[in-house]
């Protein structure tokens, strides 16, 4: 699973996910990608990202290259079951990536359009947000 090696603080506040993605909304490495088009921002866990990565690479049969453009750097905490409120914040349960609308999550290069489209469709099925397949501007079929 993806998670940071070190962090400045063990726990962080929840924060607000207002507006669209300010950066990472254009393809930078590959010719194809999937973009979040969910109406609100959301958290993607490291397990969801890993499941999507495995689904895409398995279909591509390790040809081409897959770039993961998001990283789960936000610790999500949870208190144990049947514990009363208060007495501090719970322990870190998992790591999540904050994904706002318009953010490119995965990019693929070095494979034909049909293979990339199907690989990213399988990856998108593993994610809890609405996605859109995008193609680079300088791509010629």
From Swiss-Prot:
Residues 1-17 have a biased composition (Basic residues). HAMAP family: Ribosomal_uL16. The lineage of its organism: Bacteria, Pseudomonadati, Bacteroidota, Flavobacteriia, Flavobacteriales. Part of the 50S ribosomal subunit. Belongs to the universal ribosomal protein uL16 family. Signal peptide: none annotated. It comes from Flavobacterium psychrophilum (strain ATCC 49511 / DSM 21280 / CIP 103535 / JIP02/86). GO terms for cellular component: cytosolic large ribosomal subunit. GO terms for molecular function: rRNA binding; structural constituent of ribosome; tRNA binding. Keywords: Ribonucleoprotein, Ribosomal protein, RNA-binding, rRNA-binding, tRNA-binding. Binds 23S rRNA and is also seen to make contacts with the A and possibly P site tRNAs. This is Large ribosomal subunit protein uL16. One of its GO terms (biological process) is translation. It comes from the Bacteria. Residues 1-29 are annotated as: Disordered.
């Amino acid at each position: 699973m993806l998670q940071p090696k070190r962090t400045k603080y063990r726990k962080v506040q929840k924060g607000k996910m207002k507006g669209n993605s300010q950066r990472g909304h254009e393809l930078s490495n590959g010719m194809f990608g999937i973009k979040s088009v969910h109406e609100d921002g959301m958290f993607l866990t490291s397990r969801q990202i890993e499941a999507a990565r495995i689904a895409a690479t398995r279909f591509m049969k390790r040809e081409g290259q897959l770039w993961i453009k998001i990283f789960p750097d936000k610790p999500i905490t949870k208190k144990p079951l049947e514990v009363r409120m208060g007495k501090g914040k719970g322990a870190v349960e998992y790591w999540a990536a904050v994904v706002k609308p318009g953010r490119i999550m995965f990019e693929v290069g070095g494979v034909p359009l049909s293979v990339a489209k199907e690989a990213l469709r399988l990856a998108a099925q593993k994610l809890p947000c609405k996605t859109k397949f995008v193609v680079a501007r300088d791509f010629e079929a």
